[in-house]
Amino acid sequence: MVFNHEIKGNTLVLKLSGDLIGEDTGSSVLETASNAIQDKVLKCIIDISALRYINSSGIGVLITILTKFRNKGGDVYLMKPSESVQKLLVITKLNAIFQIIQSEGEVL
């Protein structure tokens, strides 16, 4: 998996691509999110439009990020999930926990 990030105001924007398939893969993403929270960033947009595959460990990474932000009064938004990832979100009922958005403008 490859990711990059940017902070826009009080929002962390993470762009993930490839496969999110484990704690090792997601550890740097978690570290980036934790650092942003320490810097008083309250919102996180995770652009998953280029994410091809996600397994249970990858879902755990997303849930950990969500928990960290919500514990500080913030929130996490998943942006533009692919059809296969969207199906997974529905099957796992995570679409009811995460807010799904189509553009950064819905949050920024």
Regions found by a protein language model. Name each.
Residues 83, 105-106:
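Acidic phosphotransfer microenvironment of two-component signaling modules
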